[in-house]
Structures are given as structure tokens and as C-alpha cells.
């Protein structure tokens, strides 16, 4: 597949799937979860009764094409050697490990539908005691829907969510909070499309003023045994085994406690003997370089696999913002990561950063190690070896109204550019400011079309923007789409780009903060 996660192949082995196969068949393997599916089968799941080989796969791994002499794959029966296409990834799924509806927390589920036809999404709420609850939501064509999870899942619940539909959609989960009555803010995540036996996180801090958690959802039928491998900047790898999450359940683990309440700048590789989903919420009072006391929170969905490149469309080192890069090297050899900073004006700036084996490195982009202050910047990080990178940012956001909203947000970079990006969440009402940050890493100029889908349906709002080559471009959505809108968005480009959606807010006039996500690519 395009992201390197899936591989298709033919093999004569009998023990790759259950029930056992015979003869040469075509399979697809998920390298993140280890799951193997039989592609050379009919609609009832029966294996082909003849030799199947010469497979190829679509970029998203949804379709596998192959030659086969089997006569029972379609109806009416075929004869001789024929070409077949098998669809393997239906329905569509999004998973969320984090979720809490207790005092001081408000959780929402945003469901976006960028097609003209209506669709139905089934949401399964999974609680820490192993019980579940199912709800069904109808999403009109060219629209989005917002679910109040506090009402749907019930009050005072630690809850994960599994969303599924027979049609393409996108799901995000936004949360707003007054954490322990001390720190206000919000965070947001795009759901994971499948569980995995490994999850990577580049960012993490257990020092003063920071509370870090790892939330784990086990949607499977067997208990999941976990091993936490923290790659600390200070002391290398620290392994913490011996934890488990029951089937159809979720659990939260405080990283500060797992690391004996010591102060570490740390990355994490989470390992499980059965596929799970993992997120990392963090809550903080950020002192930074100036003793600021900016309170807030952030949350990222982990990465199931590593990559050799990461793109970050958003970034600024202007007054009131501090931007960092955290780089994880879980491998056994030292690596060097090359950074290209794309500025709003001027030539790109290039730097190189060493990352020792089994550790993580941290770069303050505002400093001379990055690009310095008063810059709007996108970043490309590359390495010859697989690694992971995140970009935490902390702020006293002034925005369009000189607000003074403090908080932070964090994302894992996009592994590659794309021609289409989707966002389920978006709001331009009072006390919310939404932006789209577009990074064009190529030399050719891009014509970017943004289609906004209002909640409840209606005519989509379409806007077009020109984005020059090797530049970063920012769209103020409150101006571009208009005010007082709950919207999803599709961003299409004539050349591949990267898109993020930062949002800043004063939720209900009492909880200030911000959150950001990299868009979803089908």
C-alpha cells in the first residue's frame, strides 16, 4: 500500500488464515496488526478452487486484483484464467481510545459526510467495565452531524468509541475541559482506522506542570497484555511491562506514575499481544522559556508504524507562541534527521539533528536550533531510517480579537502529501476561530479548492485559493466560510499538499484553549 502498512502476495501455505486453505491463494497482510486476510475468496468467504496469483493492490489497500483459474469466485461461474478484484476493507471504521464525560469535561463526536448520499454510522461506546452501548446516527449528504457524547454515553463515564459505516465518512472526537479544576483547554483527534499491536508516540513529558496519560482501547475478544517502552531523552529506554486491558474495554495509564513520578522528556512505543488503539492526552501548565503559566491540554492518536518523512503544515514562532519538534528513534542505531523549514517569505532553512538510539531529541523552533522568532513556518523532516516526529505548540493566542486564550496543541506529522484532505470538525461561532494551514512542498503552484459542508445539509460552500510552490498558506475559516457555522471540510489540490486545521476558543465563555489535527486522507 502507499503507506507501507499492507502487502499482498500469493502463497501455497495452509496455515495463514482460518479455516485452512489449500493450493496457491492470494492474501493481504496488515504489517501493523499482523492480520492476514484471504483475497482469493468468493462473497461467502469460500476459497478459490483453483490457483490464484499475480496480485496487485490499490494505494489504500482496499482492493486486491489477481489472476485465478478458480471457477467459484463469482456467479455465474467463470472458466479458464480470469482477472478478479476483491474488496477487503468494508465497512469503514474509526476508533477512539480516549473519552471522559465526568465533571469538568465535555466530549463531542463529529461525523462528516462529503458524499451526496446520506449514510448511517453505528457508534459503539465501550466502557472500562467491559459493557457497551450502541447508537445509530443518520448523516445527510454533504453535511456533518455532532453528537454530545456526555448525553449519548452517559455522565461520569470513561468511554472509548468505535464508529462504523458501509459508506465512506470521517470521524473526529473533540473534548473541552477544566482539568481537576486547575487547567482549562481542549483537544481533538481523528479516529484510528484500525487497531494495531504497536503504537508510537514521539512527545511526552512527566516533569512539573505536566500530567501525561496513555488511553488504551481493546475492541477485541481477548485480553490485551501491554508493554510500555519509554525512550527518554535523559536515560534512554525504560521498559514497563505487566499491564493488561480486558476484552471490549478501555483503560487509562498515567505515564508520570509508570515512570515513578520522575521528570523525563520521553517518547513511547506501546506493544500489545493483541490489537488495540492508543491515544496520549496531556494536561499542563506550561512555563516554557518565560515562566508563562499557559494552561491547556493536547491529545494525539498514536502512529501504528514509523515512516522516513513527516510534514507539518502549521507552525509559528511569533510572540505568544512557542513551537517544538520532538523526534523519536526507537531503533538500535543512532540516526540523523534532516529538517527543511518552509517560511512564508524567503528561502527554506535546512538543519540536521542527531537522535541517539533508543532516545528522543527535542528542538525549540523559536531558537537558533530552528528558525528563530517571528516566523510562520512549515516543516519537512526526513531520515534514511524509520522514525517518528511530533510538533507540540504552546500559546497565548491573540487572534482576530486580541483574546489572550492560553493553551497548546500537538500533532504527529503527515507521512506524505496528498491531493485530498478531510476534516469532520469545524466551528466558526462566537468565541471560536478556525484556520486551515496548507503546506505546498513542491515547486509547482497549487490551486486549492475548499468545500465546506454545513451541519444538517444545505448547499456546500466552495472557495478556491492559490498556493505557491515551496510555501505555506493560511486560510481564516471564519472569514472564508463565514461565521456561526458548524462545518466539515474537504480540501482538494491540483498538486499534493499537506493540510492542518488549528482551532482556538473560549468554550462556553469559560474554558480557553486550542486544538489541531492533520487532515484525514482516505
Positions of PLM-derived features:
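Gly/Pro-rich, tryptophan- and cysteine-flecked surface segments typical
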Residues: 89-522
Amino acid at each position: 500500500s502507499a503507506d507501507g502498512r499492507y502487502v499482498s502476495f500469493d502463497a501455497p501455505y495452509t496455515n495463514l488464515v482460518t479455516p485452512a486453505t489449500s493450493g496457491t491463494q492470494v492474501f493481504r497482510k496488515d504489517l501493523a496488526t499482523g492480520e492476514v486476510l484471504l483475497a482469493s475468496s468468493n462473497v461467502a468467504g469460500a476459497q478459490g478452487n483453483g490457483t490464484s496469483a499475480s496480485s496487485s493492490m490499490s494505494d489504500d489497500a482496499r482492493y486486491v486484483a489477481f489472476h485465478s483459474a478458480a471457477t467459484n469466485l463469482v456467479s455465474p461461474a467463470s472458466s479458464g484464467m480470469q482477472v478478479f478484484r476483491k474488496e477487503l476493507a468494508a465497512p469503514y471504521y474509526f476508533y477512539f481510545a480516549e473519552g471522559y464525560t465526568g465533571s469538568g469535561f465535555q466530549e463531542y463526536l463529529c461525523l462528516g459526510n462529503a458524499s451526496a448520499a446520506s449514510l448511517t454510522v453505528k457508534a459503539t461506546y465501550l466502557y472500562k467495565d467491559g459493557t457497551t452501548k450502541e447508537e445509530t446516527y443518520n448523516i445527510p449528504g454533504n453535511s456533518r452531524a455532532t453528537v454530545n457524547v456526555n448525553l449519548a454515553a452517559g455522565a461520569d463515564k470513561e468511554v472509548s468509541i468505535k464508529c462504523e459505516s458501509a459508506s465512506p465518512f470521517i470521524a473526529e472526537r473533540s473534548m473541552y475541559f477544566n482539568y481537576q479544576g486547575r487547567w482549562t483547554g481542549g483537544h481533538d483527534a481523528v479516529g484510528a482506522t484500525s487497531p494495531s499491536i504497536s503504537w508510537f508516540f514521539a512527545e511526552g513529558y512527566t516533569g512539573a506542570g505536566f500530567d501525561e496519560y496513555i488511553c488504551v482501547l481493546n475492541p477485541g475478544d481477548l485480553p490485551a497484555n501491554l508493554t510500555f517502552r519509554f525512550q527518554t531523552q535523559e536515560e534512554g529506554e525504560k521498559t514497563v511491562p505487566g499491564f493488561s486491558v480486558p476484552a471490549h474495554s478501555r483503560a487509562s495509564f498515567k505515564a508520570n506514575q509508570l515512570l515513578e513520578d520522575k521528570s523525563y522528556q520521553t517518547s513511547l512505543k506501546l506493544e500489545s499481544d493483541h490489537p488495540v488503539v492508543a491515544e496520549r492526552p496531556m494536561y499542563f501548565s506550561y512555563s516554557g522559556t518565560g515562566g508563562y503559566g499557559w494552561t491547556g491540554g493536547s491529545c494525539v492518536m498514536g502512529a501504528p508504524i514509523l515512516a522516513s518523512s513527516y510534514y507539518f503544515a502549521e507552525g509559528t514562532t511569533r510572540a505568544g507562541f512557542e513551537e517544538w519538534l520532538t523526534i523519536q528513534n526507537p531503533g538500535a542505531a543512532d540516526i540523523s534527521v534532516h529538517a527543511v523549514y518552509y517560511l512564508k517569505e524567503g528561502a527554506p532553512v535546512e538543519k540536521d539533528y542527531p537522535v541517539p538510539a533508543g532516545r528522543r531529541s527535542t528542538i525549540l523552533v523559536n531558537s537558533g536550533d530552528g528558525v528563530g522568532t517571528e516566523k510562520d513556518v512549515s516543516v519537512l523532516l526526513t531520515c534514511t531510517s524509520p522514525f517518528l516526529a511530533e510538533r507540540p505548540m504552546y500559546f497565548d493566542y491573540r487572534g482576530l480579537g486580541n483574546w489572550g486564550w492560553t493553551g497548546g496543541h500537538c500533532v504527529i506529522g503527515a507521512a506524505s502529501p496528498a491531493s485530498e484532505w478531510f476534516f469532520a470538525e469545524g466551528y466558526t461561532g462566537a468565541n471560536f476561530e478556525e484556520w486551515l494551514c496548507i503546506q505546498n512542498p513542491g515547486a509547482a503552484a497549487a490551486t486549492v479548492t475548499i468545500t465546506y459542508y454545513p451541519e444538517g445539509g444545505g448547499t456546500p460552500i466552495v472557495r478556491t485559493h492559490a498556493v505557491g510552490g515551496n510555501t505555506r498558506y493560511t486560510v481564516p475559516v471564519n472569514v472564508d466560510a463565514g461565521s456561526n457555522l458548524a462545518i466539515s471540510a474537504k480540501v482538494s489540490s491540483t498538486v499534493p499538499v499537506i493540510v492542518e486545521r488549528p482551532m482556538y476558543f473560549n468554550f462556553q465563555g469559560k474554558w480557553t484553549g486550542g486544538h489541531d489535527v492533520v487532515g484525514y486522507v482516505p
